[in-house]
Regions:
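Zn2+-dependent peptidoglycan hydrolase active-site motif and core
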Residues: 36-71, 87-92, 96-98, 102
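Short acidic/polar mixed-charge low-complexity motifs
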Residues: 20, 32, 61-62, 107
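Catalytic Cys-His active-site segments of thiol-dependent hydrolases/isopeptidases
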Residues: 66-67, 79, 110-111
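Intrinsically disordered, low-complexity
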Residues: 1-14, 104-111
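Short glycine/threonine/proline-enriched tight-turn/helix- or strand-capping micro-motif at secondary-structure
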Residues: 9-36, 97
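Flexible, active-site-adjacent loop/turn segments at secondary-structure boundaries
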Residues: 2, 24, 66
Length: 111
């Protein structure tokens, strides 16, 4: 079972981390707050498949949160601060959820 000191959102874990899906998906009600799992500089992006994406970078760590309804303004955010809202954007979204991934999965996922 995975646990986070600061989860990316409060919802139901619907998809786990594995080779074909190197991320965790959390189903959530649209508009549910999405939290930074670590402090860092927030930027945003849009991708046709992943929708609105929040990206937090600091000290060699990068985490991303996809399919968001809203990404908050760029800037510095502390761990636990709201960086966006759960949504259902992008063609790969199968319903309202947050697709959370990291470039260093062992940092958050213990793998």
């Amino acid at each position: 079972m995975i646990s986070f000191e600061q989860p990316p959102t409060y919802g139901t874990l619907t998809q786990g981390y594995h080779e074909e899906h190197p991320a965790y998906d959390f189903a959530c009600v649209p508009g549910t707050p999405v939290y930074a799992v670590h402090s860092g500089e927030l930027t945003s992006d849009y991708n046709g498949r992943m929708g609105n994406i929040a990206v937090v970078k600091y000290n060699g760590r990068t985490s991303s949160y996809s399919h968001l309804q809203v990404v908050f303004p760029p800037g510095w955010y502390e761990r636990g601060e709201v960086i966006g809202l759960c949504g259902n954007t992008g063609s790969w979204s199968t319903g309202p959820h947050v697709h959370f991934e990291s470039d260093k999965p062992y940092t958050f996922f213990g793998i």
